[in-house]
Amino acid sequence: MPKIGMEPLRRKALVDAALRTIGHHGSLNVTMSDIAREAGVSAALAHHYFGSKQQLLLETIRSLLRDLRRDAVAALIRASGPREKLSAIVHVSFQSDQFTPETVAAWLAFYVEAQRSEETRRLLVIYSRRLRSNLMASLNRLCPPDDAARIAEGAAALIDGLYIRHSLRSAPLGLASAPALVEDYFDMQLKSFPDGQRAKPSIRTL
């Protein structure tokens, strides 16, 4: 029987091991035994805590989303003003820990899995909606609602597209240039609204 109080530690160890194992394999074509071995526990214990590989993989996605949300909340709290908050979102999206080999492999594998798994797709939709919500919270204070929605969609597409290109090492520019491209997009789109819009109370975060 697992020791009392060990479950949270074991679950986290298994999630971390799942991330590393996916990174090593470059896909979700891994087994519970592979993950358990990486975590230093038995496959039976892994099944005890998660029931199936699918449930463990879903928890791994949730863990990535929680980490991203935590970093976004901290960055938005530090930022002052809507334009600075947009920059904070951009820099969190391209921070170095999002580009570790295991994290990159996991995100790309989960996008592929979303074509087959409704639950995986739902979690990735949550990520997309949170990103758009964060962008809209600041853009609504800088330009009219219709323009805010349009700019948010463009920025989200840039962020996701640049992430994928850099993940696949197919981008002609270095990773350090990616945030600057999104910042240039914001500057170009917002130059027609130099005075911004009336401030709207909004504290939406990832």
UniProtKB/Swiss-Prot annotation:
One annotated GO biological process: glycine betaine biosynthetic process from choline
GO molecular function, one term: transcription cis-regulatory region binding
Domain HTH tetR-type, chain residue ranges per copy: 8-68
InterPro entries from the UniProt entry: BetI_C (IPR039538), DNA-bd_HTH_TetR-type_CS (IPR023772), Homeodomain-like_sf (IPR009057), HTH-type_TetR-like_transc_reg (IPR050109), HTH_TetR (IPR001647), Tet_transcr_reg_TetR-rel_C_sf (IPR036271), Tscrpt_rep_BetI (IPR017757)
Pfam family, one: TetR_N
DNA-binding interval(s): 31-50
Keywords: DNA-binding, Repressor, Transcription, Transcription regulation
Keyword Transcription belongs to the record: yes
Protein's pathway: Amine and polyamine biosynthesis; betaine biosynthesis via choline pathway [regulation]
Keyword Transcription assigned: yes
Source superkingdom: Bacteria
Function in brief: Repressor involved in the biosynthesis of the osmoprotectant glycine betaine. It represses transcription of the choline transporter BetT and the genes of BetAB involved in the synthesis of glycine betaine.
Name recorded for this polypeptide: HTH-type transcriptional regulator BetI
Organism whose genome encodes this protein: Agrobacterium fabrum (strain C58 / ATCC 33970)
Gene label: betI
